[in-house]
Design a protein with these regions (language model features):
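Short glycine-/small-residue-rich flexible loop motifs, especially phosphate/cofactor-binding loops
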Residues: 34, 118, 155
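Metal-dependent enolase-superfamily TIM-barrel catalytic cores that perform enediolate-based chemistry
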Residues: 130-170
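Metal- or metallocofactor-binding catalytic centers and their adjacent structured scaffolds
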Residues: 6, 38-123
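A generic structural signal for short
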Residues: 23, 105-106, 143
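Structured beta-strand/loop patches that form or line metal/cofactor-binding pockets in enzymes
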Residues: 1-46, 50-54
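N-terminal amphipathic alpha-helix/helix-capping segment at the start of soluble metabolic enzymes
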Residues: 1-11, 122-138
Length: 170
């Protein structure tokens, strides 16, 4: 069981040398929103919130977490990450209906859920993959963000960096 004391958000943007064309539009930077939860003993867990689009999506998700989810979580006690997920989903359902922002709310809950799972795993002194029931400490990875234009060069660069699998945008 954990009692949430507080949370923090941080927005990061990594400028891209070459803009990336995605199915959503052109990305000129790689945004990231991290949420860090603290329990009443000072143990923390970190999660990431999806925020690629629109361009102001990162700041918007951070604002949602700070203004909506932080007050909902503060001083709440949870038996499990699933209990917290259900609680947040239930508490924000009507807000989603009123605002039409089911996506940003769900993405924020997902990032908080990751942070909660990380926090519960840390309380048990387990790596997250083991907390989830995984059996391997390594998993295969692939390079993504390879666009049709200039794909051959981008693929060669990824292979040179050691990637053995690629995801090509078409």
């Amino acid at each position: 069981m954990i009692k949430i004391r507080s949370l923090e958000t941080a927005v990061y943007r990594y400028p891209l040398k070459t803009p990336v064309q995605t199915s959503f539009g052109i990305m000129r930077d790689r945004p990231m929103v991290l949420v860090k939860l603290f329990d009443d003993e000072g143990v923390s867990g970190i999660g990431e919130i999806w925020c690629n689009f629109p361009a102001v999506g990162a700041e918007h998700r951070a604002n949602l977490v700070n203004s909506i989810f932080s007050p909902l979580l503060s001083s709440q006690t949870f038996e499990s990450p699933e209990d917290a997920f259900d609680y947040l989903t239930e508490k924000t359902w009507v807000l989603g209906l009123q605002t039409g922002e089911f996506g940003p709310l769900a993405q924020s809950i997902a990032g908080i859920d990751i942070a909660l799972n990380d926090l519960f795993a840390r309380k048990l002194s387990k790596p997250l993959w083991e907390f989830y029931g995984g059996k391997k400490s390594e998993v295969p990875i692939y390079a993504s963000g390879i666009n049709p234009k200039g794909a051959e060069k981008m693929a060669e660069n990824a292979l040179d960096k050691g990637f053995k699998a690629l995801k090509l945008k078409i």
